[in-house]
């Protein structure tokens, strides 16, 4: 079976789409069994449908936060590669360093090849990302966080 890889850039320059395409092309030339799907100008519903059947998501490679698409990908149990880095963006939860494969723009090919060569790592990152998304980005998690902030600041008891 092929490994389905999705990239859904809202802005192809900011998301590193040219790097993604070059990496995918090189892996195809090397005969990796992959299905690459690039989704541009698609509704969120279409993107979410693709995420349900995807293994790896190539998010964005010039930013230091996961963004909504990164969270949606993790919540759909995909292994995510992106440049979001909690050592740079210190506002990210500390357990985020293991939730996705931190990938600088010059590492897209190498890190994607690493996952394809080590399929057990795809599942490992998918599991960690899924747990991370549901720990930090549900209505319940947001409610707990807001209540904690309000209590810590004496607004509510």
Language-model features: locations:
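A charged, aromatic-enriched C-terminal amphipathic alpha-helix characteristic of glycosyltransferases
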Residues: 120-151
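Short alpha-helical donor nucleotide-sugar binding micro-motif in glycosyltransferases
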Residues: 49-54
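A short alpha->beta transition loop at the rim of the catalytic pocket in nucleotide-sugar-dependent
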Residues: 55, 75-77
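Short hydrophobic beta-strand element within catalytic cores of glycosyltransferases
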Residues: 79-84
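Conserved donor-binding/catalytic core segment of Leloir-type glycosyltransferases
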Residues: 1-15, 21
């Amino acid at each position: 079976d092929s490994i389905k890889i999705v990239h859904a850039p809202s802005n192809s320059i900011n998301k590193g789409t040219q790097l993604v395409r070059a990496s995918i092309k090189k892996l195809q030339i090397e005969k990796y069994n992959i299905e690459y799907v690039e989704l541009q100008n698609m509704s969120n519903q279409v993107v979410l449908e693709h995420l349900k059947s995807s293994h790896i998501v190539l998010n964005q490679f010039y930013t230091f936060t996961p963004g909504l698409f990164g969270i949606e990908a993790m919540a759909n149990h995909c292994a995510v590669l992106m440049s979001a880095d909690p050592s740079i963006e210190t506002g990210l939860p500390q357990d985020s360093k293991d939730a996705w494969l931190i990938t600088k723009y010059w590492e897209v090919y190498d890190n994607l090849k690493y996952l394809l060569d080590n399929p057990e790592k795809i599942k490992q990152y998918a599991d960690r990302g899924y747990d991370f998304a549901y720990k930090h980005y549900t209505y319940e998690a947001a409610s707990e966080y807001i209540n904690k902030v309000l209590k810590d600041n004496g607004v509510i008891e």
